[in-house]
Structures are given as C-alpha cells and as structure tokens.
Amino acid sequence: QYSASIDDFARIMKAGNNGGYANTWLIADSRKNEIGRLELGLKNITLERTTDGYFVGSNFPINEKLIREETDFNPQDLGQSSVARHTRWEQLMAENKGKIDVAAAQRFLGDHYDVVEKKNDPDERTLDGHVDLSARGYPNWQPPYGTAGAVQNKVANAAMIAKMSFVAAAGHACGQNFKATEHLDAHPDMSWQKSLQRDMDAHPWTMFTASK
C-alpha cells in the first residue's frame, strides 16, 4: 500500500529491523504481475520473487541458514502447527496448480485437513485453525482447548488489488461458529475467562473496496 515496488517494500521492512520476529512476508505487485517472499531475520535477510509461481507462508521462515542461526525452531517437527500448515499449503498448491482463483483461496482458508492424522479434523494444525477443539492446544502458545485459531480471512486477486479491493470473512472460514458459553461449559477449567470470552460467529465473505 505504501511502497512502489517489491524492492521498495523490502526496503521499508528492513529499515529499523531489530530481528524480533523472524518470519516470512508475502507481497504482490499487481502492476508487474510479480510476487515476492521476504524472509526477515536480524542478520539473514532474503528476498525471492517470481512471475509464474507461488509462495506460501505459515508464521515461520523457511531459509535454512536463517532458521539455524537465529531461531530454535525445528522445521522437521510436523506436529508443530506452523510446519503442518506449511506442508498443507504445499499440498494444496500442487493439487490445484493452474486452477487457483478467489473461490479456491476461500476454500483453502476453510481447510480442515490435518497432515499428521491424514484426515479432516479441525485443530491447531489445520489451515482453518481451531485450537479450541484440540486437546493438545498450541504448545508454548495456548493450553489444551485454548480459545485461539484462524478467525479472520482475506483474499484478493490481481484485478482486485489494482482496485484496492479484497474479500474478507470474519470468524472461521469454514462457517463454524464459536460460542463462548458452550466452550466454557465443556471446559470449566477455563471459567476464569468468562468475563473476557465472546461469541465468534462466522460471517459470509464480503467485498471491501477503498473509497475514491
């Protein structure tokens, strides 16, 4: 939004970078039909780009040198949510090569396939994350049945980006509602959250466009 190119985006992101969040940042330049992947560590920074491929991300970098030198992350641990989700993204990209559009992206964000269990089972390892349904929780982040997951979704194609538009859905993309009272009744150990928890209903995909 504030950059003139992928290189300009990388410049903005690198300025004042303290390395506090080693991660993958995805960017698209609709004018050049080009996409990029910026991996931003403190000392290890990489920028890749393509005009006929794809990049995916799931809250961690994939550059081996960056992972090795600046994190304690284990990219081989499929049980970790980030690794499982990255694996699922790669599967979906391969299965849908040449067929990815807005509708497909919306389906992907509502995906419930767990690559560890090899079946549909919404939990912390699925793209449409449902930590609240997982007895494992999200280690180092959320306790078993913790109230967390993927509850905001946004999709845009090149034509929409050129018009500063996108479609978004609040709540789970799968359409499942989260009801606070039901969750607290099922997990009384979380009763201390009663004053904080709110329902999170799933809302339909809606188009948003910047005003002229």
Where does each model-flagged region fall?
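C-terminus-biased signal that marks the final domain/tail of proteins
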Residues: Q1-K212
